[in-house]
Swiss-Prot record:
PTM text: N-glycosylated.
Protein name (record): Synaptic vesicle glycoprotein 2C
Residue numbers spanned by region Disordered: 22-128
Cytoplasmic side: 1-154, 213-226, 270-280, 342-437, 600-609, 658-670, 717-727
Modified residues annotated as Phosphoserine in this record: S75, S76
SUPFAM superfamilies (alphabetical): MFS general substrate transporter, Pentapeptide repeat-like
Keyword set includes Nucleus: no
Keyword flag NAD: no
Transmembrane segments: 155-175, 192-212, 227-247, 249-269, 281-301, 321-341, 438-458, 579-599, 610-630, 637-657, 671-693, 698-716
An annotated Gene Ontology molecular function: transmembrane transporter activity
Functional note: Plays a role in the control of regulated secretion in neural and endocrine cells, enhancing selectively low-frequency neurotransmission. Positively regulates vesicle fusion by maintaining the readily releasable pool of secretory vesicles. (Microbial infection) Receptor for C.botulinum neurotoxin type A (BoNT/A, botA); the toxin binds Sv2c via extracellular loop 4.
Organism field: Mus musculus (Mouse)
Modified residues (Phosphotyrosine): Y466
Protein location: Cytoplasmic vesicle, Secretory vesicle, Synaptic vesicle membrane
Length: 727
């Protein structure tokens, strides 16, 4: 009887062991199937295995299968239940320690529903929570990495890119006078050259900023700077005006991505207490770019001897050398940028934990070695990564031909950029975007509007002063003479010239009124702003002159001959003094920004971004009223320097605030949109203020003051980001 009872007990125990093992293996197989499906959906290869414990420990500690009998006998788990599939991962790379992204989101027996069963609102809510946790953790990690050699190296690399943007703004204004004559640009088309660059920069800022949030800061910056450098070099060699316009358009399109990408990139490797100051120091490179362009223009463009020609079809003048020299900062930044890593904050945002961890370790080790502490260990093991939400569909390889796949890829990327841009108007950044839009537009409109108004007013004052020095010659007669010198700023009225020779004469701002030329010869004559009004020419020979029909107004010709008229466009001697003056004024105006840059960098983290932004814009608006007293060139130049020095603090603080208000997933996109709006406001300001130069001072002064003060008051309503971590 006792033996029979023992047999039944052993049989029950064996049956329970078998049932337990069957259930365990069933649950294991279900979880493995879900794991594979999850891996295929999320494209993870190993992260789910990082904190996965042994399969035999499926039941939590202290929890046993109901009805289980405790025994000391060897279980079948010691020799059975070994799954050969587990051997696939033995000895393989298990990844750098990261957050629990393994089975937390996997649907399994008795666990919460997985991501595929959640609606988008729930997923976005979880992602926001993850981003808040990541922001706090990332700030601590950056503080542990310290501020040192890595940040300074990146500072100079990104500074070269920002310098290239500053150069691009000045290049067209400096080469325009020379390019107009060299490329035969008509007066009606000269304005296109200045506007086309801003148009390219406007489109480029939006596109490259959006792309930086998709493919990364480094990748986007490399591409956009390469585009700028290539077409900037190409523009120095093209001959036709149309090709030159296209090259400058594409060059502007490339450089448009520099500002939004550079500031987003650099801000993401700076700790909170360093961010405001060092972003302000970075702004100084834009000023250096302006100084570099002014100095190079001053040194190169007036040297007409620095030119060569290959027949009459190809002309390479000094202004083309200047264009090449101005492309050097861009090329330097591209070369240096290839040695820098991607932004670790961006990599964490897109779920690339391991790459971000290695870059953060690189930053830490680089700074520690520079401090003489190479033994210090990077203690971070796990970094939170936000939940990834699929938005776009991956293109399959069988999508038609290669060009169709390329077209679909471009369209998909553009659609993704547009979706990111629309999210800039979603909660919680919608109100900030609207306020930033107002501040960016008003500051750009007032700054660039007055920037073009100042030189035009100075030029207008120069013209008035030049007119006062005009020499008037009236009712005189010259016979049997020969002239071979330059005639400048003269008006000849009622004159009579007989049997005279004008040999190699350069006429500059000379007007002949009611005059008679008898048996005269004009040989190898060049003229600028020279006209013959109501004049009579008798038996006169014109040989190798540039006298176009429009220079003869109501004039009469009797038995006259025109031989070998000069064709094409030559670099003229016009405005040699004015060219130097333009370079000098721009040089001083750009140099005046230096004190404002230093002050803003030192006080950015002390008095706050908003105080500096609002105060600088209000003071700039008030300073406009001093223009009432600008009655001379020197006074206007002084006002220009004062105005530039005050507004630079507003620009620096606005850049810092914009970077800090947007979260990482839309930071470059939002910055790019606002920078594109800045360029549109600049074009509008140039048109409006440029049309008011010769009318009155009152309208430009009141308009600029009102716009700047209103923008400054709106800027004071923005959130203070001085104590916030970078989201």
């Amino acid at each position: 009887m006792e033996d029979s009872y023992k047999d039944r007990t052993s049989l029950m125990k064996g049956a329970k062991d078998i049932a337990k093992e069957v259930k365990k293996q069933t649950v294991k197989k279900v979880n493995q199937a879900v794991d594979r499906a999850q891996d295929e959906y999320t494209q993870r290869s190993y992260s789910r295995f990082q904190d996965e414990e042994d399969d035999d420990d499926y039941y939590p500690p202290g929890e046993t299968y109901s009805g289980e009998v405790n025994d000391d006998e060897g279980s079948s788990e010691a020799t059975e239940g070994h799954d050969e599939e587990d051997e696939i991962y033995e000895g393989e790379y298990q990844g750098i320690p990261s957050t629990n992204q393994g089975k937390d989101s996997i649907v399994s027996v008795g666990q919460p529903k997985g991501d595929e069963y959640k609606d988008r609102r729930e997923l976005e809510s979880e992602r926001r929570a993850d981003e808040e946790e990541l922001a706090q953790q990332y700030e601590l990690i950056i503080q542990e990495c310290g501020h040192g050699r890595f940040q300074w190296a990146l500072f100079f690399v990104l500074g070269m890119a920002l310098m290239a943007d500053g150069v691009e703004v000045f290049v067209v204004g400096f080469v325009l006078p020379s390019a107009e004559t060299d490329l035969c640009i008509p007066n009606s088309g000269s304005g296109w050259l200045g506007s086309i660059v801003y148009l390219g920069m406007m489109v480029g800022a939006f596109f490259w900023g959006g792309l930086a949030d998709k493919v990364g800061r480094k990748q986007s910056l490399l591409i956009c700077m390469s585009v700028n450098g290539f077409f900037a070099f190409l523009s120095s060699f093209v001959q036709g005006y149309g090709f030159f316009l296209v090259c400058r358009l594409l060059s502007g399109f490339g450089i448009g991505g520099a500002i939004p990408t550079v500031f987003s990139y650099f801000a993401e490797v700076l700790a909170r207490e360093k961010r405001g100051e060092h972003l302000s120091w970075l702004c100084m490179f834009w000023m250096i770019g302006g100084i570099y362009a002014s100095a190079m223009a001053w040194a190169i463009i007036p040297h007409y001897g620095w030119s060569f020609s290959m027949g009459s079809a190809y002309q390479f003048h000094s202004w083309r050398v200047f264009v090449i020299v101005c492309a050097l900062p861009c090329v330097s930044s591209v070369v240096a940028l290839t040695f820098m890593p991607e932004s670790p904050r961006f990599l964490l945002e897109v779920g690339k934990h391991d790459e971000a961890w290695m870059i953060l370790k690189l930053i830490h080790d680089t700074n520690m070695r520079a401090r003489g502490q190479p033994e210090k260990v990077f203690t971070v093991n796990k970094i939170k990564t936000p939940k990834q939400i699929d938005e776009l569909i991956e293109i399959e390889s069988d999508t038609g031909t290669w060009y169709r796949r390329c077209f679909v890829r471009i369209r998909t990327e553009l659609y993704g950029i547009w979706l990111t841009f629309m999210r800039c108007f979603n909660y919680p950044v919608r109100e900030n975007t609207i306020k930033l839009t107002i501040v960016w537009f008003t500051l750009s409109f007032g700054y660039y509007g007055l920037s073009v108004w100042f030189p035009d007013v100075i030029k207008h004052l120069q013209s008035d002063e030049y007119a006062l020095l005009t020499r008037n010659v009236q009712k005189d007669k010259y016979a049997n003479f020969s002239i071979n010198f330059t005639m400048e700023n003269q008006i000849h009225t009622g004159m009579e010239y007989e049997n005279g020779r004008f040999l190699g004469v350069k006429f500059k701002s000379v007007t002949f009124k009611d005059s008679v030329f008898k048996s005269c010869t004009f040989d190898d004559v060049t003229s600028v702003n020279t006209y013959f009004k109501n004049c009579t020419f008798i038996d006169t020979l014109f040989d190798n002159t540039d006298f176009e029909p429009y220079k003869f107004i109501d004039s009469e010709f009797q038995n006259c001959s025109f031989l070998h008229n000069k064709t094409g466009c030559q670099i003229t001697f016009d405005d040699d003094y004015s060219a130097y003056w333009i370079y000098f004024v721009n040089f001083l105006g750009t140099l005046a920004v230096l004190p404002g840059n230093i002050v803003s960098a030192l006080l950015m983290d002390r008095i706050g971004r908003l105080t500096m932004l609002g105060g600088s814009m209000v003071l700039s608006g008030i300073s406009c009223f001093f223009l009432w007293f600008g009655t001379s060139e020197s006074m206007m130049i002084g006002m220009l320097c004062l105005y530039n020095g005050l507004t630079i603090s507003a620009w620096n603080s606005l850049d810092v605030v914009t970077v800090e208000l947007y979260p990482t997933d839309r930071r470059a996109t939002g910055f790019g949109f606002l920078n594109a709006l800045c360029k549109a406001a600049a074009v509008l300001g140039n048109l409006i203020f440029g049309s008011l130069v010769s009318i009155t001072k009152a309208i430009p002064i009141l308009l600029a003051s009102t716009v700047l003060v209103c923008g400054g008051l709106v800027g004071l309503r923005l959130p203070d980001t001085r104590t916030q971590v970078l989201m």
